[in-house]
Structures are given as structure tokens and as C-alpha cells.
């Protein structure tokens, strides 16, 4: 006898896009340093996945015998929450609280976990500049994600 258990919860699929480089800077020693962020997104359908990750199938081209195709739906606009770990600029993995903040993505928000330079990599206001740069990057690339 088979029994199907329905937990009664319909949760969206949550994706974590990691290592999105938003800035190239130098540390205090002059060595190059890539600053990156992670983006946690709730995806509602496969169309959103294709928009972000690309489609591996060749695109169909309509010809004179086929009906015109409808315009592709626009990406849903979501508010973005930027998350900076409270580490006193001592250095910590930006993704250490992903599981704790999954509820925000389930509620429909996009959550950006942003890496900023530690105090060993740059003196204040370098961290504020990094935060502003991350905001500019997200605004400029909002349509991509």
C-alpha cells in the first residue's frame, strides 16, 4: 500500500547565485582583490531560470508559415535586501547566514550577500565605498537577475 504525504506547504524554488564579481579593487599591499556577492532568488517558473542561466536549446525562428510569437514576459521586479555581516570589518564569509535568511527569499525578496574589504584589506571608508559599489552594480544589472 502506498501513501502520499502532503505537507500542505507550497514553497518557491530558491537559487543561490554565488561569486558574482561586482568590483575589482586593491588591498592595502597593492595586490588585486575581486569583491563578490551572492544573490538568493525565489524563482517561480522555468522561464525565470532560462532568463538567468540561459537556454541551451536553439532559439526557434518563426517563418512565413508559423504564427507570430508573443512577446516574452518581463522579469518580475522584486525588492532587494542587501546583507552585510556584522563582523566589525574583521573578515567573515559573506554566505555564513544564508540558511538563516532563506525566509526572506521565500517571502519574495531577492537577498544579496555582499563581501566588503576587511580592515586588513582597506581602511575606512573603503568598506562604505564597497557597499555603494555593490548597490550601483545591482541597479545596473537588475534586468539580468
Where are these regions (language model features)?
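Short amphipathic alpha-helix adjacent to the substrate-entry channel of hydrolases
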Residues: 95-112
